[in-house]
């Protein structure tokens, strides 16, 4: 079975109990009355509370999964639980939405935003149908970080079409200079975008033909951005992820980073939503 031929979607959403993750759960279930969602939350109690805020008709199509993406043992246990559920596997899509925001150390930020994304991909992608989709939630902070980091070698490494996992992990190990420690969030998202490209190169060919992309949801008002000038409701943050999940495979890229307006964007500089989509030097 392929994602294109499957009769309904079964999508795993991490960080699903609030903010953009919760809005994605609602959007997925509203889009198709036969769709199912695996609602992955770090706290089972908070996940249950969020579940009860949804209409009863939606609740019947949700599989609650307790999972802390920053914990290898938690992710492993969650995979074991989900793999035993024939009603919610195989998956047609994975949305890596779980994340932490500004003001934390590089290690703590990347533990969730980068390593957590990588861990979920490696663990749950074997449950995807052929032609399944992976959407990694990134941020404009990633390109913004690269545009001002002043390190041309790092920019080249993280935007290389053929970036390797070894290179990405090497950049992480090098970390940030002392005067850039406030850029931990943007740094983590630049790693997510590079990993997205690496993973796409690895999985885009048959037999699995998995489509992997990343996107920014836009500047959305969530717990992460409260008090920082964000005003857009979480519901406005689902546009790009939904586009990457459901648009015909011939109409989207592979390993690309998309803006909140669903247009391709560069990895090393900010593109204003509504402006011309990015094209690299090969026009692809």
Short names for language-model regions:
Residues 119, 214-217, 222, 227-284:
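C-terminal helical subdomain
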Residues 10-13, 90-95, 134:
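Conserved hydrophobic beta-strands of the Rossmann-like cofactor-binding core
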Residues 2-38:
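Canonical Rossmann dinucleotide-binding motif of NAD(H)/NADP(H)-dependent dehydrogenases/reductases
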Residues 54-73:
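Rossmann-fold cofactor-recognition segment
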Residues 77-80, 104-111:
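Active-site Tyr-X3-Lys motif and surrounding loop/helix of classical short-chain dehydrogenase/reductase
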Residues 69-89:
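Conserved Rossmann-fold cofactor-binding substructure of NAD(P)-dependent oxidoreductases
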Residues 99-107, 130-206, 216:
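Catalytic loop of short-chain dehydrogenase/reductase
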């Amino acid at each position: 079975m392929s994602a294109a031929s499957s009769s309904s979607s079964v999508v795993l959403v991490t960080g699903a109990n609030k903010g953009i993750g919760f809005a994605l759960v609602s959007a997925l279930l509203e889009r198709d009355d036969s769709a199912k969602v695996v609602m992955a939350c770090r706290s089972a109690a908070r996940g249950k509370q969020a579940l009860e805020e949804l209409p009863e008709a939606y609740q019947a199509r949700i599989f609650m999964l307790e999972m802390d993406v920053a914990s290898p043992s938690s992710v492993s246990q969650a995979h074991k639980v989900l793999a035993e559920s024939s009603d919610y596997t195989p998956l047609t899509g994975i949305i890596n939405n779980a994340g932490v925001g500004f003001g934390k150390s590089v290690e703590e930020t990347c533990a969730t935003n980068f390593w957590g994304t990588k861990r979920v991909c490696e663990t749950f992608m074997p449950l995807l149908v052929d032609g399944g989709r992976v959407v990694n939630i990134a941020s404009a902070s990633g390109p913004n970080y690269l545009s001002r980091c002043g390190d041309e070698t790092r920019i080249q490494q993280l935007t290389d079409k053929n970036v390797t996992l070894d290179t990405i992990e090497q950049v992480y190990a090098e970390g940030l200079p002392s005067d850039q420690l406030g850029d931990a969030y943007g740094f983590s998202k630049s790693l997510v975008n590079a990993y997205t490209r690496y993973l796409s190169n690895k999985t885009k060919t048959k037999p699995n033909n998995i489509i992997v992309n990343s996107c920014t949801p836009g500047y959305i008002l969530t717990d992460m951005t409260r008090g920082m000038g964000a005003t857009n409701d979480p519901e406005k943050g689902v546009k790009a992820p939904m586009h990457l999940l459901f648009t015909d495979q011939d109409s989207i890229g592979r390993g690309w980073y998309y803006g909140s307006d669903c247009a391709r964007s560069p990895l090393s500089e900010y593109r204003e939503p509504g402006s011309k989509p990015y094209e690299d030097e090969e026009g692809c």
